[in-house]
């Protein structure tokens, strides 16, 4: 027969284990679910209140930006990749859009207006179309690709064998295969398209774009989500504070001047 002391002992073991707070909470939730299951089977169980044991904490930030060394190696080897992968990677690198969005780009999505260059994309997660700025060189490369392969306006830029949109997993698999052949790797993995969103978000924020601006560009619904894409955030906050106080060395707390008089 299960007693409250048994649960207390189990929680104590978990508490002393070297596990994340989220893992701890998951174990507590699983235990509650199991007891509820027994209750549904008409097996008498003690009353268990998981909220008394759950820990409070903050979600961990995973640094996922692709190292510059890896990017430099990949770009150096890129001319040897199949042409469609070359262009898909450059779009990913320059825009940080989702892999699914790269695969569903249509001819005519890249265009110029005066000295400005734009890309029109449909963000499936947000269910809306938006326009983002892109380098002029990228627009030229896309236009050349469309002309070379006779891709008509409105057709998918990257097609599967049946003429539909290119498959996202196929893109990843082909990139991994090409990277393996050339010894390109990123630590314990070879290629993850989504990590380039971290690179772009981190770069934008590091160059003075506000959190709100980065959020709007990436198409997130909240700033908290956007912060998960900005790597080295604590270091950047400390750096910003150092810069502020170095420029305001005469800064004094209110009342300090009066005390000196």
Language-model segments: residues:
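Catalytic-site neighborhood detector that most strongly recognizes the C-terminal catalytic loop/helix
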Residues: 123-127, 218-243
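Flexible interdomain linker/hinge and immediately adjacent N-terminus
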Residues: 44-76, 122-123, 159-164
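N-terminal core-binding DNA-recognition domain of tyrosine recombinases/integrases
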Residues: 1-62
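Conserved tyrosine-mediated DNA breakage-rejoining catalytic core shared by Y-recombinases
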Residues: 95, 104-143, 261
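C-terminal secondary-structure termini that scaffold catalytic or DNA-interacting sites
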Residues: 162, 244-261
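Basic, Lys/Arg- and aromatic-enriched nucleic-acid-binding interface segment
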Residues: 57-60, 69-99, 125, 197
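Short, polar N-cap/turn motifs at the start of nucleic acid-interacting alpha helices
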Residues: 110-114, 189, 209-228, 256-260
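Short, basic (Lys/Arg/His-rich) helix/loop patches that form interaction surfaces
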Residues: 151, 173-216
